[in-house]
Amino acid sequence: MGVPVIRAMRARFALAAATLAAATLLSADPVAYVLNGPTWSQPQTAYRINTANLDLPALSVETAVRSGANTWEQQSAAFRFVYSGPSSQTTNTNDGINLVMFRNASSGSAIATTYWWSSGSRIIDADIVFWDGAFQFFAGSSGCSGGFYIEDIAAHEFGHALGLGHSTSPNATMYPSVSACNTGNRTLDADDIAGVMALYPRLLVSAPTGLRVVP
């Protein structure tokens, strides 16, 4: 049986001044990471979670998704995701609400899909769908059997949500495939860190001038 692919299905359509897109890029460039182009305009982006699913209690899902999002704090770029509470929404649409949800359906070999909308050079909305009808999801780091840990799948999908495509480095969180019960995605590879730093360079604050320390 082949290894399921984590991918974001590519779809484009006009929606006011926005474009719906999804990260499906693969790179032949010597640099392993791939930048999709648009970025968020603010250093913090809020998201909500609809925890309704077939496999786990709501609190376990919330904790696991938040852990996956927090994976992207393992670097010093000028960007982070911020959890803003639960949601009952069940559709992914450009509504200004960045949503993570589970759907009792399948989408080919995709374990999860990230949809994002952009206006010009800025991402304005991103939604993540876990395909709960096709795969079983687990939380934590033990007990998984033939399924996938939410933490690791979420880490990959939040990478798409911040603007990264698929890396060609097999050790990267943003590599396009993952084996069952893998726990490696929750730790960023140097390639992932380089990618997010390229999108959101660290802000350097200069020390004030004209000051002296008086002993």
What are these regions (language model features)?
Residues 1-8, 24-26:
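Short, Lys/Arg-enriched N-terminal segments with co-localized hydrophobic residues
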Residues 4-7, 204-215:
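Enriched but not universal
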Residues 9-13:
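N-terminal Sec-pathway targeting helices
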Residues 14-25:
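Bacterial N-terminal signal peptides
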Residues 25-206:
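Zinc-dependent metalloendopeptidases
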